[in-house]
């Protein structure tokens, strides 16, 4: 995410990025929902060192992305950071608006587990169409956009810290995670976000026809809109706040 105005982090830029990523999350899930669960894509294979196809694909894709210069921004966090290659091409430095340790703050392990254990069964049907390579490519797209959305919490935390540095500094020095979480939580805003992503899923996921009288219920949407609301309520926003708290606890280091 680029800060607006040079090295000054803009609250408006952070909000705009979060809203834009809502669209990306909805579309990523819609694309993945075109295929059934395809369980063999997640089974360990002896020919791949006991890795599953999805793990192999993500590792290889991240290595290629790293060579091209990806993962240079704090919100772009790899799922398998061990031994990633260095970029082979010049990259433009991002404005230094966060604490230097920001790139080390990650909840990708929790995102991975949530996606495969909890979320995927909610919006895909049980079945096997054999399209395993395409399936894991779409899984990667979902994982990447969810990870980026959640790790933008680093910027949210920095903006909030600068808005009330004395209050946050006191809690940080006391290592009071619970009070930090309370300060970062705005229930009214979270309710608006849940309603907005649900509406986007209903709008983007409808099957468009030329029949002006056609009305589609949620059951006819490509992804149940309530799944998006649940995704943000139970996982995206809580994990984002986990990122914010972890970032803030080290903000004064």
UniProtKB/Swiss-Prot annotation:
Single GO biological process annotation from the record: amino acid biosynthetic process
Q: What is its EC number?
A: 5.4.99.5
Q: Which InterPro entries match?
A: Chorismate_II_sf, Chorismate_mutase_AroQ_euk, CM_AroQ_sf_eucaryotic, CM_II_prokaryot
Query: Which leading EC class covers this enzyme?
Result: isomerase
Q: How is its activity regulated?
A: No allosteric regulation.
The UniProt entry lists the main location of this chain as: cytoplasm
PROSITE patterns registered for this protein in UniProt: CHORISMATE_MUT_3
List the SUPFAM superfamilies hit by this protein, alphabetically.
Chorismate mutase II
Catalyses: chorismate = prephenate
The pathway where this protein functions is: Metabolic intermediate biosynthesis; prephenate biosynthesis; prephenate from chorismate: step 1/1
- What is its subcellular localisation? Cytoplasm, Cytosol
Entry GO MF terms: chorismate mutase activity; protein homodimerization activity
Cystine connections: none
Instruction: Report TM segments.
Output: none
Q: Which GO terms describe its cellular component?
A: cytoplasm; cytosol
Domain Chorismate mutase, by residue range, is 2-253
Q: Which UniProt keywords apply?
A: Amino-acid biosynthesis, Aromatic amino acid biosynthesis, Cytoplasm, Isomerase
Superkingdom classification of source: Eukaryota
List the Gene3D superfamilies hit by this protein, alphabetically.
Answer: Chorismate mutase, AroQ class superfamily, eukaryotic (1.10.590.10)
How it assembles, according to the record, is: Homodimer. Interacts with Cmu1 of the fungal pathogen Ustilago maydis.
Q: Which protein are we looking at?
A: Chorismate mutase 2, cytosolic
Q: Which organism is it from?
A: Zea mays (Maize)
Name of the gene this protein is made from: CM2
